Amino acid sequence: MPENVAPRSGATAGAAGGRGKGAYQDRDKPAQIRFSNISAAKAVADAIRTSLGPKGMDKMIQDGKGDVTITNDGATILKQMQVLHPAARMLVELSKAQDIEAGDGTTSVVIIAGSLLDSCTKLLQKGIHPTIISESFQKALEKGIEILTDMSRPVELSDRETLLNSATTSLNSKVASQYSSLLSPMSVNAVMKVIDPATATSVDLRDIKIVKKLGGTIDDCELVEGLVLTQKVSNSGITRVEKAKIGLIQFCLSAPKTDMDNQIVVSDYAQMDRVLREERAYILNLVKQIKKTGCNVLLIQKSILRDALSDLALHFLNKMKIMVIKDIEREDIEFICKTIGTKPVAHIDQFTADMLGSAELAEEVNLNGSGKLLKITGCASPGKTVTIVVRGSNKLVIEEAERSIHDALCVIRCLVKKRALIAGGGAPEIELALRLTEYSRTLSGMESYCVRAFADAMEVIPSTLAENAGLNPISTVTELRNRHAQGEKTAGINVRKGGISNILEELVVQPLLVSVSALTLATETVRSILKIDDVVNTR
């Protein structure tokens, strides 16, 4: 990847030549900086081009600690890439922005930006001013969004089949694609359970918790309406509680410690016995107060200061038939409270019956020799949350399955935000190229030339899809162009059959928001890079 460009300061060179020649002499510098920025950003785009589409390749990423990640998710690849050049870093940020906005299309957005930068290079070499290129690209973008919106067809959230097709298309390019028949319905069900389809305008993905558990295969993934915890039940005798009353405490059930570092000197056995009796009475009192509220399942937040649960407290809780789960992570507390309707308690005096959540069943489930999970189901409170349990034979598979499910959830979220679909398989990009070329003929001068270059750049997506699928990119794109010129708007590359077909009939669809967001963000980034004419290193 190109190194940082250290700007040569022509001003100092000129000033050194004598007082009369204090003019800025290095005229070529802005052009050099611009080309350096473009080539650095293009290098990033070229690095992930091969991972586009269902037949795209995966990348194996090894970090400094030796941890390995296998993925073809554009945002994940770029996030872990060591990028030095500031312009190349802009493309990493671009992919991140697409991930936040749409959740899918993170590879496409970088490839489109790389292709647009390629077009910029050719236009700059022909002597066209960067500002003219930038303004023309903005015009082309506005027209492009119009074209994409015309191509789209509305979708209702009650149309379950369309939602499934969108999720399946997203999963097809992932490692977990062979499990799409399981993961697609799971993703659709998860989103539909946490929103009200009639009024929802977005989906808060924090309401869908993904729990990773090593062991089994991706086939063992499941959707649970309720709460799933990976922590073990501390008192092994109690593994099932019906009509559960669940308390969540943020204080420790162990002997109190002094605030300051004091020392207590015990001089005889009687005093020693008294200390132990006091400790026993103190803990028993805590446990009795918990039992008095009717609590029969107790969750204890993880404590970094000391043991959150002493053996003595566990003994008393066991006798009183209270199921105990300790080491609950702080970041999980909000989700737990929303799911089961409990409230976190920071002091024993506030532990009352109205702070408890309730559920039909709290049960520790054995996973065929690969550990245990605690499931709390039948929650009485209407907090709309669900949990997806992701299983896999090793850490790499589980992490990639989690990313795949996240992308599928994001696709459904896009359809909730903007209820419109367009065809996939490179069809929208070819249609854009064709219609923008027609539009460029209505413009005059340099603008027409720049819009035409923008249109040509759009062909990179179908070309890359064909290349990654082992087809001839030139003949495929040419045939696709002809089919679209004859009015077949939904003709796209069918990667499975290795040819061109009506992509809507093949059920390859994607949300309109993904394409519009990719086009908008890529164009904005390219315009930013184009306007930079100097890189200044500050102290």
Swiss-Prot record:
Enzyme Commission number(s): 3.6.1.-
SUPFAM superfamilies to which the protein is assigned, alphabetical: GroEL apical domain-like (SSF52029), GroEL equatorial domain-like (SSF48592), GroEL-intermediate domain like (SSF54849)
Positions contributing to ATP binding: G53, G105, T106, K174
Nucleotide-binding recorded as keyword: yes
Domain of life: Eukaryota
Residues modified to N6-acetyllysine: K21, K288, K302, K319, K326
Family stated for the protein in its record: Belongs to the TCP-1 chaperonin family.
Protein name: T-complex protein 1 subunit delta
Species for this entry: Pongo abelii
Originating gene: CCT4
